[in-house]
């Protein structure tokens, strides 16, 4: 993974600032750099998982209807629930991992701008998102709008997404420290980091894991070595190697003593 980040480092600066590692299936695995400070807020019906690989970032949100800044430091992980207004602010010489899921056919995304009070919607547009390149034309549309010129909304919000105004967000946490604190619980097995919502994130220790993937499954080998067999094809994973197992695959993973790995899957209907 780190080698891939180095190879694509030219894309983590303006004007691009991001690169998709995996994106053909359910899981959208991308890396994002900066500087990229923005005024727009994104609203989607799925969760987003953040991990800061290099440097810190600020995620602006509306929590219980009030503006809030969440600082995600290098090495920290954070899960943003479904249907939360959020605006990622990224700084120079930083790289972050962001995982989203494929949108269901009936789902829409929203791009919103707020007035100076931070809570009144100035302008918004909703659309079915199949590609993140759709966002740039929407931003352009806002800057050409009367609302941008006057700073005053011209109509009431028409948001059809049931925006979350009740959840108190978790604090970002250092992944390495979590793994250290919970080592006895997954040393020879596995333990859930997240499992109640859409994203199912598990830490795995030494031993074997096998099954049939109903959906996509992304592996990230954090420490030590692992051998992964997918539909009779074998691959060796070393530290920071990653692998996507496609939906409908039979797999078997064997991790050596002292090995630590993460697996990530998604249930798109979990928060419906």
From Swiss-Prot:
- Where is the stretch described as Domain A (catalytic)? 1-154
- Start and end residues of each stretch annotated as Linker: 155-169
- Please classify the protein's predominant subcellular localization into one broad category: cytoplasm
Recorded GO MF terms:
3-hydroxyanthranilate 3,4-dioxygenase activity; ferrous iron binding
What EC numbers are recorded for this enzyme?
Answer: 1.13.11.6
Q: Which cofactor does it need?
A: Fe(2+)
Report the sequence similarity comment from the record: Belongs to the 3-HAO family.
Fetch the NCBIfam families from UniProt: anthran_nbaC (TIGR03037)
Known function: Catalyzes the oxidative ring opening of 3-hydroxyanthranilate to 2-amino-3-carboxymuconate semialdehyde, which spontaneously cyclizes to quinolinate.
UniProt protein name: 3-hydroxyanthranilate 3,4-dioxygenase
């Amino acid at each position: 993974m780190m080698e891939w980040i180095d190879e694509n480092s030219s894309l983590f600066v303006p004007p691009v600032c991001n690169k998709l590692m995996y994106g053909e299936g359910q899981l959208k695995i991308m890396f994002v750099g900066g500087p990229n400070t923005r005024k727009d807020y994104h609203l989607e019906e799925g969760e987003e998982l953040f991990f800061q690989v290099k440097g810190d970032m600020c995620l602006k949100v509306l929590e219980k209807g009030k503006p809030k800044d969440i600082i995600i430091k290098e090495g920290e992980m954070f899960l943003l629930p479904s249907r939360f207004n959020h605006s990622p602010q990224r700084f120079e010489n930083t790289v972050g991992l962001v995982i989203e899921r494929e949108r269901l056919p009936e789902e829409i995304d929203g791009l919103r701008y707020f007035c100076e009070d931070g809570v009144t919607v100035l302008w918004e547009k909703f659309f079915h998102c199949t590609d993140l390149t759709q966002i740039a034309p929407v931003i352009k549309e806002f800057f050409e709008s009367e609302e941008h010129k006057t700073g005053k909304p011209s109509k009431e919000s028409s948001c059809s997404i049931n925006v979350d105004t009740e959840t108190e967000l978790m604090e970002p946490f250092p992944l390495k420290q979590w793994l250290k604190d919970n080592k006895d619980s997954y040393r020879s097995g596995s333990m859930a980091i997240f499992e109640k919502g859409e994203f199912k994130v598990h830490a795995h220790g030494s031993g074997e894991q096998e099954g049939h993937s109903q959906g996509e499954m992304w592996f990230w080998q954090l420490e030590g070595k692992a051998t992964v067999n997918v539909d009779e094809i074998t691959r060796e994973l070393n530290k920071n190697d990653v692998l996507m197992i496609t939906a409908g695959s039979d797999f078997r993973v064997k991790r050596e003593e002292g090995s630590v790995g993460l697996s990530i899957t998604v249930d798109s209907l979990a928060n419906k």
